[in-house]
């Protein structure tokens, strides 16, 4: 079988609802790589939050920050930071709305305020500690994503920023990306680098930030626990993550000999 490019989201896809990796997923990912397929993590997370999962699964390629930072075989092949002036203007709006922000750089993150309950809950869901506080951290640095902590109905106040796209990942937080940025854009950069046809690309996901990725690749797989919008556009809907959904889909799609 010719090798394929296979992209996996993390939460609700690689990770089950207890933030553990099912044994069937471990074995499937290892076998995909053993048989010559290129396996990627494709996540909204930062490189430093993706790293433990990469090490655990022996994966050396990833798309992070929803497509803004791409690595193939341990080499950075694409970076797309947010414009500093636009960050400054958004921070003014966030300050007026009393909405905390977390700056996400390549190797660290900083918060605009300390000990905010919404940040504590959102960041805690990523199994990481509350970031240090530095409201000017973005100045002179490459910031690839912001975490804006606001309720869904409060998000409308940020529609006037054409430089950004907002993608909700938590009931209390939304990712702030460069306009047009997505996991699909990250995959395009991989395909530009490697001689692969779009028909040889597969992606697995469960959330709203996977929509463009699932729609773009040759075969998009929605987990059984995915949001309805993703299931509607997927080429294949597998079993939930808690029911060995990745292993089931890989078998049904004939990706292993």
From Swiss-Prot:
The keyword Metal-binding applies. GO terms for cellular component: cytosol. InterPro entries: Cof (IPR000150), HAD-like_sf (IPR036412), HAD-SF_hydro_IIB (IPR006379), HAD_sf (IPR023214). GO terms for molecular function: magnesium ion binding; phosphatase activity. The lineage of its organism: Bacteria, Bacillati, Bacillota, Bacilli, Bacillales. This is Putative phosphatase YkrA. It holds the Pfam family Hydrolase_3. CDD domains: HAD_HPP. Signal peptide: none annotated. NCBIfam families: Cof-subfamily, HAD-SF-IIB. Belongs to the HAD-like hydrolase superfamily. Cof family. It is an enzyme of class 3 (hydrolase). Its EC number is 3.1.3.-. Keywords: Hydrolase, Magnesium, Metal-binding.
